[in-house]
Structures are given as structure tokens and as C-alpha cells.
Amino acid sequence: MSELLIDNISMRFDLPNGSSVQALKDVTLSLKSGELLSVLGPSGCGKTTLLNIVAGFLAPTAGQITLDGNRVTGPSAERGMVFQQGALFEWMSVRENVGFGPRMKGPLNAETREKVDHLLDVVGLQDFKEKAVYELSGGMQQRVALARCLANEPDVILMDEPLGALDALTREKMQSLVLKLWKETGKTIILITHSVEEALLLGERLLVMAPRPGRIHKEYRLPFADLGVNQDLREVKKHPDYAKTREEILAMIWDMEEEIMGRQETA
């Protein structure tokens, strides 16, 4: 059982003019193996900065990240990343993209090829495996990105607004796919999003972050992700607590945005 511990993380960025920005302050959080966490908040609350620290792309100013007791000091195959733009090799085929990580560890054997084909089947791309990535739609490219991440067998999957650029219908289908993969693989997932609805549907735990400095403002434990594994997401939205929680969070973020605007006007 892998456990991710975010221990009292702070992050300060120094600016060229000699000033600095406190992006995160005293963020502490623990995730057990298989948890699905969504992180939400207004622009400037540090949610992407936090994800980049967990990924090992940034070193925090203070505090530490550990996975199974081992300190995170840089990127690792134990933590897979899915970006808003798929960051795929567009000239390669779908199958070559998904198999890229395993191939970096050595020649693909029959077992690994079978795993790649299984992942393509899971994300619904078996019929497109020989297509070049540039021939695919945005939604299909994000399916490739998910499969490629899973092919590396990470303990933790980090998702930085992976569905933000998709149209509404494709986004809903991808949300259902994320829930399916979460339940089938048992992976720990951290998902960053600007969408309140997405955060509610794709988080059994949901963090609302506040800005300047970025910090955890409130945490929710929600039933909607578990419900969405076996139900149409449009049906999940009819749950009596869904609309209530949605309005509560929208009001919370609206107040944060208003406070930011007020500071700017008086500065």
C-alpha cells in the first residue's frame, strides 16, 4: 500500500525585480493508495505548483514530499503525469506512444506488447493503434495520454487539467473513463481542475484552495465519484447533495475572486 505524504510544503518564487511571490504556504496532506483527489481553486491558488512539486519538477522552498517513506527529489516513474495538452509524439503511432515508456526500459517483449494492447482496448483505441497521433481528435489524444501514463505502471497519477481543452460531450465521456480507470487499476490519482462540476464528479476527496498564499481552504469527502463508476454522470448530478455542494463551492470561490479584485483595486 503506497502512501503519499505532503508535509508542510511552502513555495516562494523570486522575481527579477527583487521581490518574491509566496505561491504555497504550509500545505499538508496525506493520500492512501487508491484515493482519488480533486483540487480546485481560483487562479493563483498554487494548485498546479503543488502538482509540479509532487511530480518532482519543482523543489519546494520548505517542507517535503514522501512516497512510501521515500523523499521525492525529482521526477520518477512512480509518479506519472497527464497534461492538459497530451505532450505526445505526434509523428509516432498510437501504439508506439503508449509503448514508449516500457521501451525505454528495454526491448518490448510479448508480455509488454500484450499490456499495451490491453490498455488501448481499455481506452477504446484498439481500432486506431496504427494511426499517427496527429490524425486523432483532442479527446482521442487524451485517451492516448492516459494509456501511455498507465503503461509505465506508476503508483500515483497526476493530472493537470487534462480535460480542460475538450468540448462538453467529449469531456463528459473522458470523465467517465477516468472513473473507470481509477476503479479498475486502483491507482492513486490527483486531478487539478478549474471546473467545480468536474471536481465534484472526479474526487472522492476534494480540496478547495485559497490564493495568496496558496493554501488548503476546505476539504470535502464526497460520494459522487463512487456513484459515477456505475451510473451515467448526468444521473449522478441529480443526487440531492450535488447541487447544494456545487453552489456552496461556487460561492466560496466567488468570494475569493472578489477579495482578490478588491486587493487589486486598492493597491
Task: Locate the predicted segments by residue.
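The feature captures the beta-strand-to-loop junction immediately N-terminal to the Walker
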Residues: 40-42
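Helix-to-loop junction immediately C-terminal to a conserved catalytic motif
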Residues: 55
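Conserved ABC transporter NBD signature motif
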Residues: 63-75
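Short helical segment in ABC ATPase nucleotide-binding domains corresponding to the A-loop/adjacent helical element
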Residues: 95-103, 113, 117, 221
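Conserved ABC ATPase "signature" region
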Residues: 110-128, 180
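Conserved signature/switch motifs of ABC ATPase nucleotide-binding domains
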Residues: 131-134, 152
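Hydrophobic anchor residue at the start of the ABC signature
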Residues: 146
